[in-house]
């Protein structure tokens, strides 16, 4: 039986694309997905006319709470017009970096409450708890994947599809969800610079990669200097 249609926000679609429906494990780096979820929330708010992005900053256009409780909570946390950061706006890259984990947790809890995902608690080495979020109904995750594949085949003709494709590429998911091969993955990568939220996400992902590479160089002895 086909599951009933369920209205999903952009961050929810991204999470359903990113999580293995059976194991609940992300197909990309967990921190990158946190950035992507935060970026998707911002773009969803922009689609609803609540915020916009200008010069790498978030500007609130309409501070009135949207119906979705998650979006309302995030909007409330942003600067209202004329308050907060200078000129009443917030640095996009910094906001994505600082709030990504919290925003993703809110999204996951929202999906669990709606019985879209299940929350399973595991323990690393029998001690440290961590969570996995498999699909409550794998058919719904498959439907989201099928919609993405159809949009990919059509060249992502609408703004929402292009944003989702850009976020998928920015967090490193294109290899797991794209079906058009290397050429299509490059096309998705090129969308990143066209989408202000995806660009902020990608900058944070690159920063993490650079930090890891730097730590690896130092740990292997390449960061020191010697001499007589």
Give a label for each model feature.
Residues 55-58, 121-126:
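Short, Lys/Arg-rich nucleic-acid/phosphate-binding segment
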Residues 38, 101-104, 140-144, 204, ...:
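Charged, low-complexity, helix-prone segments enriched in Lys/Glu/Asp/Gln
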Residues 51, 116-117:
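Short hydrophobic beta-strand motif reused across regulatory alpha/beta modules
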Residues 1-98, 214-228:
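Short, amphipathic alpha-helical interface elements at domain boundaries
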Residues 149-228:
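Short hydrophobic helical membrane-anchoring segments positioned at the boundary
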Residues 22, 26, 82-86, 119, ...:
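Residue-level signal for secondary-structure boundary elements
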Residues 62-106, 113, 126-166, 170, ...:
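Short, amphipathic alpha-helical interaction segments positioned at domain boundaries
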